[in-house]
Each structure stands twice: as structure tokens, then as C-alpha cells.
């Protein structure tokens, strides 16, 4: 997705272990998260002492190779975030209810100038369980991103241990490559 030295943005990142994995491969990580406690735990687990500064209405936790913005992701601006080479959406789109997803997809485009994305979604019978994570069908991924990105499904697999007590859950991994011109 992005090589060493690339800056990867993880929206609604929480304290995912993927951050340490990316940093271990030389990526610079930027993230956004609503839960301050999760970010404090993340930095403790990474054994990093962040510098905490204001970024508009957000707090910015920074250390070598990592910047995490705490607060409402919709308050994050391109000026706060800075340049991004790629987006890794592991659990953000599926965390949002349907009425917010279109706004979110547009916000990511405006934040990053349409950086390429790796997106992970789940599909299941939404009537059987409330989200989050919410079920996001393949046609919705195409509707949200197809006008601005070439949408390619890389892999589809059943979630082995299910999700939310459901046994029939499918995980889809998508690559979104910006359409240029």
C-alpha cells in the first residue's frame, strides 16, 4: 500500500496494533480518534512520550513518526493533517451509521487530496445485529467511492469467529485508486 517513508492516515484509529506494524516498516503514521484514553494507551504501548498541542478544536499527540488527532474527525482539516500518501481504513467506515458514511467518504477525499486507500468492510444481515460495526455492502462501497476512485476488491473471506454473535459475516478488502483527470 505504501512504502517506507510514506505517510499513512488511519481514520478512527483507536489503539490498533496496525500502527506499530506500519511504523515498524518505516511508514509515518497519522491518525484521528475520538477517544483520548485510547490514544494515551496507544502511546504508552508504543513507549513514546507524545507532545500534546492544540490543532483547532482537536488535540494533536505527536512523537517521532506519528501524529494522532483527538476529537471529531470532521473537524480535522488538510492544514492540520498535512500531506498523506495513503489511507488505511481498518474500522472507520464500518463504525459509522449509513447516514454519515457519504459525508465521511467525501471528507477523506478533501483531507487527503484523494490519496489511495485500503478499506476493510464487513457484510452481514444488519437486521440481526445493531452496529457498530455496521454492515457495508459492496454496492455501497462502489456508490461512495466509484466516482473518484477505481474500486477493486482484493479479497473476500468469511470472518472465522463471526462478529457480534453472528456466524455469517464476510470481510472484504478493497483497494481504492484515485481517478486522475
Predicted features by range, described:
Residues 1-6, 15-19, 31-66, 70-80, ...:
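Class I (Rossmann-like) S-adenosyl-L-methionine-dependent methyltransferase catalytic domain
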Residues 9-14, 92:
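Class I SAM-dependent methyltransferase "Motif I" SAM/SAH-binding loop
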Residues 13-15, 98-99:
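Short beta->alpha connector loops
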Residues 23-24:
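Gly/Ala-rich phosphate-binding loop of Rossmann-like dinucleotide-binding domains
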Residues 27:
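Conserved acetyl-CoA-binding loop of GNAT-fold acetyltransferases
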Residues 85:
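Conserved acidic residues
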Residues 88:
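A conserved beta-strand element that flanks and buttresses the S-adenosyl-L-methionine
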Residues 95-107:
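A short, conserved alpha-helix within the catalytic core of class I
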Amino acid at each position: 500500500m505504501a512504502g517506507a517513508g510514506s505517510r499513512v492516515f488511519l481514520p478512527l484509529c483507536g489503539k490498533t496494533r496496525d500502527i506499530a506494524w506500519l511504523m515498524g516498516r518505516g511508514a509515518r503514521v497519522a491518525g484521528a480518534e475520538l477517544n483520548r484514553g485510547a490514544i494515551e494507551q496507544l502511546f504508552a504501548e508504543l513507549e513514546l512520550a507524545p507532545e500534546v498541542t492544540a490543532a483547532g478544536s482537536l488535540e494533536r499527540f505527536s512523537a517521532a513518526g506519528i501524529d494522532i488527532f483527538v476529537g471529531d474527525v470532521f473537524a480535522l482539516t488538510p492544514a492540520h493533517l498535512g500531506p498523506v500518501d495513503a489511507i488505511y481504513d481498518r474500522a472507520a467506515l464500518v463504525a459509522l451509521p449509513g447516514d454519515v458514511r457519504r459525508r465521511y467518504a467525501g471528507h477523506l477525499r478533501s483531507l487527503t487530496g484523494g490519496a489511495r486507500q485500503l478499506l476493510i468492510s464487513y457484510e452481514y444481515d444488519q437486521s440481526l445485529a445493531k452496529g457498530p460495526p455496521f454492515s457495508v455492502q459492496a454496492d455501497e462501497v462502489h456508490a461512495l467511492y466509484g466516482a473518484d476512485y477505481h474500486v477493486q476488491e482484493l479479497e473476500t473471506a468469511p470472518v472465522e469467529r463471526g462478529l457480534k454473535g453472528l456466524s455469517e459475516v464476510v470481510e472484504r478488502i478493497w483497494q481504492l485508486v484515485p481517478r486522475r483527470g
